[in-house]
């Protein structure tokens, strides 16, 4: 904390004595700015000074006046996306210039370790195909990534570390694997530059990405205990409420973006009853503070992990699925089919390519309105009990399913609430589920345990979302 205060004082002294425009780190060489809109540019200068901003794409001079603390902000009109490299010159008497700027689409990634997970992987946790992805990364000249350093703060701050990097083998190992694969698909389809801001922290809870005044209302959160202001406790920051919001969200809210991508939830397992509403609150707050309307919010279902007997994370997945129903302009992709059996106790599954692609399909279909792209897999609709079997109907399965035999992931129970592995077979456009041990079915579940991967998808290979027909405790 003392080091942070000293650094802040030095920055203020430099600004006052040099009179040179100081920009936040997120405004840097190589950045991508959102196309065809008014983007915000901001920073510090001398107190009550006029700052001029001159982008090379229109050679127009925009002006802003700093306040008594030297803070200023301006809005600048951006052109249509292209691969032309631009510059922006800032001056309050002395000049600062940013170079190699692209105009395109900017997406903000956040969450915990599965969003943070870089192409280089974690210890004993590789990313599938990473070496090839890294080796060929320089071909993606239109992709730029800004990785925000972990920055837990007790109070909101104005700046955080993390500047834009071009895509190349030297830089790519540090890129979010999910974010980069999202960007690759988006760049291929839209053929315009894609910018990714990755502000994630492994192990973080949803409460960590909310401000103090909201978290203070939650009866299960003790701020004085959970924040722990004392110095020397940086290691636990990822589990603390509000700290990520203060240090990794608040400093970035002036940056104009197209939408949010979210991969989080593992650290909220066991708190499924509050998760959907708190995620909704977070999205509402972020949208309000960015001030860009109802920005799209697409998120990832937590992957199968842990015991095949328990269902704590299954309840969290159910809360995630329900969250998309109460969050406007949102959607969730499933990962139930993307985990190998040997990854049962690996909370960081290796397949990040399909996670990124599925997020891209959702953005391309819903946000960019590209017809013909499917983004949502089958969703449980209804159940009929007939002749000792459960006949299940689904939405988003009009073309049928991806397999005719060896259907896995289903369980069935009678009124005794004891679930048994079930036989599942196609029955026209339905799936027929039964078990010799359950003569009179009452409920069916699919993928509804901590680790219960399934293999059902529609003919676009988008997986069936885990579900249960019951509401038993």
Regions found by a protein language model. Give the residues of each.
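Bacterial Sec-dependent N-terminal signal peptides
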Residues: 1-22
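Cell-envelope and extracellular/periplasmic
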Residues: 20-473
